[in-house]
Amino acid sequence: MKYLIGIDAGGTKSELVAYDLSGSIVFEKIGGAGNPAVNLENTVNNIISLIGDCTEELGKEECLLISIGMASVETGNYAELIKKYVEGAFGIEIVVLNDAEMACMAYFGSDDGILAIAGTGSSCYVQKNGKGEMVGGWGHILGDEGSGYHIVMEAFKNIVYRIDRNMEFDDLSEKLLKKIGGSSRSEIMEFIYGNEKSAIAALFPIIARGAADGDLHSAAILDKEGKELAELTLTAYGKKGFSGHVTVGIKGGVFHNSALLKQTYINELEKHLKSFNIIEENISATKAVLYLNSRK
C-alpha cells in the first residue's frame, strides 16, 4: 500500500499521521516536541523516531512523500538541515515547511484564506493569489499575543503585581500557584524561568475553566487575548489587500478550548469585516501532505 506521511511538529508535541492515496488515515502517533530553535538535536531525533515507528509498520519503500510543518524552520538553515538529516535516515522525499504555511495548505489548499493559529504560540498565515505570508509569529519576546503562553504569563503578571503590593490573591492566582506547588518569589521565578514555554502554556486550561465557571479575571484575560488575535487577523487581511469576502480558519488549543475567547474573536471580526466565513473545524496540518502530493 502506497502512503504519505504528514507531521505537525509543535512546541509541546509532534503529531504524525499517515494517509493512503485516497486520504484515509492508516497510521497515527504522537511524539516529542519539534522546534529547532529550542533544541535542534532533540527535534531531529523526535522526528526520526516518529517516522521510524510508522515506516516499521507500513514499510519504508511504500512511502511516497513526507511533509513536515515546524515552527522556526524559516530561520537560518533549519529547514535545510532537517531535510538533510531526515532524508539521510530514510531515503524518502521530504518537504519541510513553516508550521503555519503547512497548516494553511491543509485548510485551503491553493485557495485564498487567512489561518489564525493560537496554541503554545500564535500567528496568522495568509495566502492570496497563490502567494503566502506570515503575519505575527514573532515569538514570545516580540509578540505571541493570544497564545497559551502569553495568556498564562498575563495571569502570572497579575500574581507578582499582587505580591509586590501585599494584596490578597484572587481565585485564579490561587489555582495557578497551587498547580505549580508554591507561592514564594523563588518558587514562582523557578517555574517561569526554569521551564520551557510549552510547560507554562500547559496551564492555559486552568484559565479557560475559570472563565467558563464565571471567574471575572479569567474572562477578562481571554476577552483581551481574543481581541488581540482578531486584530492580528485583520492586519493580515489588510496586508494582503483583501477587500471583500474572505475565508478564515482557526486552529489550535486556545481557540478550541475556550468558547469565550473564540466568540470574542468572531465578534471582533464581525465589527470590521463585511463578509467572511469561519472554518471552525480543527483540521490537522498533516493533511497538507495530500495537497502537496497532488501537485507532484
Describe the residue ranges of each PLM region.
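Solvent-exposed, flexible loop/coil residues
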Residues: L40, S67, N77, G139, ...
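Structural motif
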Residues: G69, V95-L97, I279-E281
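Broad gene-expression machinery/nucleic-acid interaction feature
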Residues: K13, L65, G121
